[in-house]
Amino acid sequence: MASRNIWRVRRNFLFDLRGWVPQYSAEVFLKSIPFRPFSVECNSKDGENGDLLNNLLTMGVDVDMARRRQPGVFNKAVTNEQELKMFLLSKGASDKVIGSIISRYPRAITRTPESLSKRWDLWREIMASDLEIVNILERSPESFFRSNNNLNLENNIKFLCSVGLTHKCLCRLLTSAPRTFSNSLNLNKQMVEFLQETGISLGHNNPTDFVRKIISKNPSILIQSTKRVKTNIEFLQSTFNLDKEDLLLLICGPGARILDLSNDCTKRNYTNIKKRLLSLGCTEEEVQKFVLSYLNMIFLSEKKFNDKIDCLLEEKISTSQILENPRVLDSSIHTLKTRIRELAHAGYDVSTSSIALLSWSQRRYEAKLKRLSG
């Protein structure tokens, strides 16, 4: 009878705790060691919470990635991964998305359900649906989980509304530069005040409208330093010899996009553009006019700019054609080569005709190609 009882004890027992179904043998049972509600094997390091690691593995979290990003989370005795999972599932997130969010920003599991709910409600004041927020979290989990200071978030929303930002602009900010709302309120105030002062100094008669224009053109500007933005404004003014009126028009328009670019990157890329075009026989005035006509080219690294110029020159396209059509530099080298080849096959010679269609949208280009091909 005793041996039969022991045999029964040696059978595996199934427990269903918090959704897990691990198995335990008699050796564990007879030693009176408390059962752990996890069965996934993992290699925990000293000081790490083994149960947490097993739990995260079961949830599809890339533990190695999470360790590299925020190792301290795994030493915490109390975490809220199950509560986080249930909360995000209720908002429409999939298991795969939840695993990805925690893998890239493991600190998310330290947020309480109450804090998550409050923060979500504040975001919903701006976004139209839960799914839109889930999409932002999937792309940038840090933007939502980086801070649990919901009062700061609420104050930022109120402040940005008070300076004239529309609901549409706030929505774009949250979508494109969500870290804006995790900034301290003082940081956002400093940037807005700096922009207002800049607008006034350049002769803008409505500083609030100036701020709104800059932010709508460049949502990322609020997460940059005032020093960086100021240096880029000074660079534009000195490089292109602009008076206040022209500078104002530039930074309220296409120039707004480069205000948050690294100062070193701005100068290095422009220096390369200038050097390359001068080597092709352009004058300094032509270089300035070329860059001002399409400032986006300043985002091109030295290699990308030079490779695209080389590609165009190899196809017998002249420097003057490039100067007249700076937007062709927006297209990838693959697109440029493919279109030039297709146009040649259709009897269109880019060396003697307009090259503007090299930068057209795919739909517009295909319609043109169809007409050329008869």
Curated annotation (Swiss-Prot):
GO terms for molecular function: double-stranded DNA binding; nucleic acid binding. GO terms for cellular component: mitochondrial matrix; mitochondrial nucleoid. The keyword Chloroplast does not apply. Residues 146-147, 224-228, 301-308, 332-335, 361-368 are annotated as: Interaction with DNA. Is a phosphoprotein. While the DNA-binding activity is unaffected by the phosphorylation/dephosphorylation state, only the phosphorylated form of the protein is active for termination activity. Functioning seems to be regulated by phosphorylation. It is found in: Mitochondrion. Residues 1-37 form a transit peptide. The record marks 139, 179, 327 as: Interaction with DNA. Pfam families: mTERF. It comes from the Eukaryota. Its main location: mitochondrion. Keywords: DNA-binding, Mitochondrion, Phosphoprotein, Repeat, Transcription, Transcription regulation, Transcription termination, Transit peptide. Monomer. Contains nine structural repeats of about 35 residues, where each repeat contains three helices. The repeats form a left-handed superhelical assembly with a solenoid structure that wraps itself around DNA. Transcription termination factor. Binds to a 28 bp region within the tRNA(Leu(uur)) gene at a position immediately adjacent to and downstream of the 16S rRNA gene; this region comprises a tridecamer sequence critical for directing accurate termination. Binds DNA along the major grove and promotes DNA bending and partial unwinding. Promotes base flipping. Transcription termination activity appears to be polarized with highest specificity for transcripts initiated on the light strand. This is Transcription termination factor 1, mitochondrial. It comes from Rattus norvegicus.
